[in-house]
Amino acid sequence: MIIGTRAVMYAPVEGPALFAILEDAAYQNMDGMMPYPQARGVMRLRAKSHGGVFVAMSNARTVQSQWENTGPGTVETPVSGYSTAIHPLASPLKDATPWVRWLNRDELARLADATIGARVPHTAVRALSKALESGPVLLSIPQDSTSEALSCAKCHRQARCAKCSGPLQLPADRSESAPRCQWCGAASIHWTCPGCGHERMRVVRVGAAGTAAELAGLFRGVPMVLSSKAQGLVRDVPCKPMIVIATPGFEPRVRPVSNERGAAGHEYRAVAILDAWTSLYALGVDARLDTLTAWMRAVSLCAPRSRGGQALILGETDPAIAQSLMMWDSRILASKDLDERMETGMLPTVAAACVWGRRDAVMTLMQRIGALGGDWAVCGELPGMLGPVPIAQPDTVDARELEATADRVKAVVRVPQSQRAELAIRLHRETARHVASREPGELRFRIDPKDLI
């Protein structure tokens, strides 16, 4: 048996082996070095060549997995194809998971909670205080961030591009008045919210800070532990009454103080998801999936309902995310995401590649592969190319020295899944020509990118 991180996808094996990957959509499974392989695709390819079995495991089902076992038009490629879905039975699943409640405005109004709008309403304070009588409580908070998102000034729905549904951002050049799409670069002139019809936007800064100081006033005298990238990782905490505040990926394990409590000594008595509203403004194609994955990972540390465990979602979020967590059925979100991607022509319903580098090099490549005025100018009824959009200069000094200009852009090319292999061949051929002919400027590409931004 070979167990490891991303690099283990290349480990030598013999015979019809089992190739299993955990959290196949995680950023850590995407190699950041040329040729940018994905662990999921590499392991599926190796399983096929070895006559073995490939298994993708995660708390939240990815859109790729949903498409492979339910999506119409699924195409068999070396790195994807038809698969069999595995989901736990309802009865044992209910016994193994906590009671999950969504305390949004409607639910708090139904409960006649007078603290509607508070970061931690009284209903949540009572539930968490009760849980603290018998053990630790985990509060999951968003990562601190300086990123900005645009939303409707009235209903707070995220502002998205009418052309490709990408997130809008303020232009880097403040002389421009119209926000631009981060995916296709189109200017959003005369924007109107599709939810309420409002015409104004507002800037939302996503992140959380000062949580421990704020909660100290709600839970007086209760010990608190903070685990985050900024504060440092806390690996485990004793199974005693305390509040543990952690960002996604930094949740400590519960360490039993004795063997008398059995499995209960390894569990949080309650888990609360704070600032759920930040999920409404998360960027990226897999933003909702990443949110659900992080929340499921945190809630999985909670005691099951048979031992009194409960989880609370505090604040507004996408109903599909909340329902998936409350039912512990990520197929709800995966199905919705897949339907939306079929409408907008996004992965995995199409094959796509990100191409970036100097503007003239990118545009020349797009023309040569047929994405500009050629046979790939359209993908179905949608444009075959998105962009180009300006991107930041490389962080490293060496990469900066390779740039003859600051005009660095990224574009996306989309083709039907049946032409995925041809897309890879054309991109490889044209980038090789660019290098061999010593044409100036950076030029790179990535097939099936995790994000389009």
Residue ranges and their predicted role:
Residues A26-P37, A112-I116, R200-V204, S279-L289:
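Flexible beta-alpha connector loops of hexameric P-loop NTPases
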Residues V55, N59-A153:
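Conserved interdomain linker/interface between the two RecA-like ATPase lobes of SF2 helicase motors
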Residues R6-H50, F54, H266-A282:
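SF2 helicase catalytic motif II
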Residues I2-L18, A246-E260:
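Conserved RecA-like ASCE ATPase "motif II neighborhood" in helicase/translocase motors
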Residues R119-R220:
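Cys/His-rich short segments
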Residues Y82-A112, F219, Q231-R288, R297-I453:
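Accessory helical-bundle/CTD segments and flexible terminal tails appended to RecA-like ATPase motors
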Residues M1, G15-L18, K48-V55, P136, ...:
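Loop/turn-to-beta-strand initiation segments
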